[in-house]
Amino acid sequence: MRVLGGRTGTLLACLALVLPVLEANFLSRQHASQVLIRRRRANTLLEETKKGNLERECIEELCNKEEAREIFENNPETEYFYPKYLGCLGSFRAGLFTAARLSTNAYPDLRSCVNAISDQCNPLPCNEDGFMTCKDGQATFTCICKSGWQGEKCESDINECKDPVNINGGCSQICENTPGSYHCSCKNGFVMLSNKKDCKDVDECVLKPSICGTAVCKNIPGDFECECAEGYKYNPVSKSCDDVDECAENLCAQLCVNYPGGYSCYCDGKKGFKLAQDQKSCEAVPVCLPLDLDKNYELLYLAEQFVGVVLYLKFRLPETTRFSAEFDFRTYDSEGVILYAESSDHSAWFLIALREGKIEIQFKNEKTTKMTTGGKVINDGLWHMVSVEELEQSISVKIAKEAVMNINKPGSLFKPTNGFLETKVYFAGVPRKMENALIRPINPRLDGCIRGWNLMNQGTSGVKEIIQEKQNKHCLVNVEKGSYYPGTGVAQFSINYKNESNPEAWQINVSLNIRPSAGTGVMLALVSDNTVPFALSLVDSATEKLQDILVSVESMVIGRIEAISLCSDQQTFLEIRVNRNNLELSTQLRKDSFHSEDFQRQFAILDEAMKGTVVTYLGGLPDVPFSATPVNAFYQGCMEVNINGVQVDLDEAISKHNDIRAHSCPSVWQKTKHT
C-alpha cells in the first residue's frame, strides 16, 4: 500500500473526536509531560504544505481519518487503514483502546503494528501451498500462484491430467493429479522411460524364460501369454499344455474321435452318410448318376444268393414223364449253374450250366456218366431261348430252336419209383453235398436271368406266384456288362501281393474301370486286423458335380487327384501302382507320383502291413472303426477291377454281399424313356 504525505490536523482535535468517553481519562503528570515533549510538532508556517507521511502523521503523532485520507489520497486505502490503525492505538498507547489489543498482539510495538496495516500481504492472505508471491495493492492484494495452482488466493489445484491442450498431461498411459502438480505412471507390465512420461513394455518372456514352462511364451503389450498348439490349453498349475477333449463339447453330429491336439468327426458311411463341408455335420451321400433300377417279377434273378440255390422245386409226375426244361436266358457271366435236377434218392442227376459262355451238360444215371459242352457263346447280354429235352435214347439241346447238341444216353435219366417220377429241380446252384461230385467241377454262381420257363412240361409251376412279392428275386430289366456295387456291402478276396522272387518286396498294381452313381465311397481297401493300411476312395469334390480320388494309409491321405468328372455315362479308367518307395496315381488325363520321402511314416506302415497278411475288400470296408480311414461309405456304381494283371471275378470272392452283381450293371436312367 502506498504511503502518501498530506496536511495534518491537530493531534488534540483528532483525539477529541475518536476517543470514547469511557476511555478519556486524564494522564498522569509524568505521562502528560512525556507526551507533550515527545509528540511536539514543529511550529512552522510550512507544516501544512508538507506531503503527508505515515510515520510522522500517524506514528509519531496521532492522526484522524481525514488526515489518513490525506496520507493515502484515496478512499479504498483509507477505509482499509483507519479501523486497523485505531486497533493498533488501542493496543500500544498506554491505557487506551484496550478492547482491540487481542487482535494486534502479533506486533511488538505501535510502529510495527501501523506499518503492517498498509501491507495487504501481511498477514498472508494467499494459500501457503499454492502461492509463489503476494503482491501488495491499493486496499487489495494479488496472489501470484505456483505452477499447478489457480484461484484468487491460489487455493485451487489445477488438474493437469484434464488439460484439453496437453491431453492426459502428456502421459502415455496413466496421469495422476497431485496438489499443485501431477505425475505419470505406467500400467502393470510397463516401465517408465527417462522422460517420465512415456512407458515401455516389459518383455516378461526375456526376463523369465521359464515363466510358461513347456508352453510357448508370447509377449503382449503390458503382459504375456502362454500359448499352446491348436487343440491344447495351458495349465497354469503344471505350466504345461493339456489336450483339449473337443468331443466332450459334442461338436460332431455322429461320431467324434479325440486325439492329442485335435479331433475328427466321422459319419456312418455304411448307412449312407458322409461328412459335410463343415467337417462336423453329416449329410446323405447324394446320387450323382441315376441308374435304371426297374425290375420285373417275371424275370428270375439267378444270383440272388452268393451261397446256395435261388429256388427249389419238387415234381412227382407219372412214371412215363421224361425230363425237359425250356426257358429264355440272359447273362454276361461266362460260368455258372443254370439248373440242376436229381432223383429223390440222389442216385441220378442232371446239370445244365454255362462254361466259357457255352452250354454245358453233365449227367449221371444208373448206366453212364457224361459231360458235353457246345453250341455258340450266349453270354452276350441278349435273351436266348434254351431248351433241353430228354428223348428216348438221347438228350437234345437247342438254342433258339436250333439243335446245338445231341447227347446219346443209355436208359432214362431218372428211374421211376412206385409208378411215379420224383424229381427235384434247383435253380442256379447244386446241393452242397454234390459240389464235389460233378464230373467236372464248376463255380455254381451265375449272374443271369431266366424268364418264360417251362419245367417238366408243367409250365411255370407256380414259380411266378412264389417270387412275385420277393424283390430280391426279380431281375433288372436293363443291364450292361460290368460289376455293380449297390452301396450296401463288400466283396472279400485273399490276394497275394508279394513278389515271389523277393519275399521282402511287394507291389500293388490296380487298374479300374469305374462309373460311379454316388460321388463318395471306398473302391478298394487292404485290411489288417482293425486297421486299413491302404485304401482307394472317391469323395465329392469341393467343386460342385466333380469328385476327388484319394489314396490313404490308415487315416492319412497320401495321394489325391482333385476335381475330375466321374459321374457320367462313360466309364473312367483309373490306375494305381504302389511299392515300398513310390505311389503312382493316374487317369486318362493326369498322372501324379508320391514318394516315400514325403510320407515316411505312412509308407513304413504300409510296408510293414504288406509283409504280413492283408485282406482285400472291394466296394467298401468291413467292420472296422470309423476312424480307420478318411472315407468309410460303401462304393455305389459299376466297377471292374484288375489286380496285378488278373481280372477280378466277383464269383471267386471268399464272400460277397448278395446285392453285389458280379457281371451285370444297371443302365443309366434315361429321362426320355420314362416320360
Swiss-Prot record:
Region (Thrombin-sensitive): 88-116
Residues where (3R)-3-hydroxyasparagine is found: 177, 219, 258
Gene3D superfamilies linked to this entry: 2.60.120.200, Coagulation Factor IX, Laminin
Cited Pfam families: EGF, EGF_CA, FXa_inhibition, Gla, Laminin_G_1, Laminin_G_2
Keyword annotations of the record: Blood coagulation, Calcium, Cleavage on pair of basic residues, Disulfide bond, EGF-like domain, Fibrinolysis, Gamma-carboxyglutamic acid, Glycoprotein, Hemostasis, Hydroxylation, Repeat, Secreted, Signal, Zymogen
Disulphide linkage map: 58-63, 88-113, 121-134, 126-143, 145-154, 161-175, 171-184, 186-199, 205-217, 212-226, 228-241, 247-256, 252-265, 267-282, 288-567, 449-475, 638-665
Entry-linked CDD domains: EGF_CA, LamG
Cellular localisation: Secreted
Pro-sequence residue ranges: 25-41
Any one GO biological process: blood coagulation
Residues covered by the Laminin G-like domain: 299-475, 484-665
Entry keyword Calcium: yes
CC per GO annotation: extracellular space
4-carboxyglutamate modifications at: 47-48, 55, 57, 60-61, 66-67, 70, 73, 77
Main function: Anticoagulant plasma protein; it is a cofactor to activated protein C in the degradation of coagulation factors Va and VIIIa. It helps to prevent coagulation and stimulating fibrinolysis.
Name of the protein: Vitamin K-dependent protein S
Organism of this sequence: Bos taurus
